[in-house]
Amino acid sequence: MARVDLKRRGEIGRERRARTRAQLIEAARRLFTTRPFSSVTVEEVTRQAGLSKGAFYSHFRGLDDLWAAVAAELAEAFEDVAGASGRPVADPVGRIAAGCAAFISEAQRDPGWGALIARGAWDFADVACAARERLKANLRLAQKEGRLAPISIEVGFDLVFGVVIQAMRSASEARLSPHDVPDVVLGILRALGLSAEEAEGALERAGATARGASSAPTAI
């Protein structure tokens, strides 16, 4: 009788489970790119993945569990862009400009990711949580320096975050070209209260990132 390698059998089982879970999450991501989260069913996810409902329920208790898994991946992907290496930008307004440009440019480079983030950033509180806090911190610092309009930080946050998310959606739908990215960022900075000259200077300090590159020196 052949000897059974229980350790290897266990490894194979874990690898198979990991692949099945990844298939389900990827299927959900593809559906979520064009559909509201609440409209997707278990049947559609399993059909998209080519798996049975039994396979689904061996990995997730239900759709809420699946949403959470997708959200966790989105948050990780968002932070990967946010934490991309590059030269640091000391100026808080320059950091805002660099971060805005990086996320929009990444949505142009990877439209599926951009579309999913554009949806998930509003639907899942955990997505972009760290980037949200960094943006607010940079807004507070810039306002303390007297460089922004006298608006609340929450209003400033909604302005920046809302425009960036919409621009990411437009970029993922090929309605925004790389040449449009600086104009979007300049519009955000002007809306925050910077003069045209100050906004151009911040864009320059943000470096190549704000001219359409896909990696951020320091995220918003």
What are these regions (language model features)?
Residues 1-35, 39-51, 65-68:
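Basic, helix-initiating cap at the start of DNA-binding domains
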Residues 1-8, 137-144, 173-220:
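C-terminal peripheral helix-coil segments that are non-catalytic and often amphipathic
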Residues 41, 114-118, 151, 197-202:
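Short, hydrophobic secondary-structure boundary micro-motifs
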Residues 50-60:
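Short hydrophobic/aromatic patch on the recognition helix
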Residues 60, 65-74, 117:
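Alpha-helical DNA-contacting segments of helix-turn-helix folds
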Residues 69, 76, 80-112, 123, ...:
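Hydrophobic alpha-helical connector segments
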Residues 79, 98, 120-169, 186:
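Amphipathic alpha-helical packing segments from all-alpha helical-bundle domains
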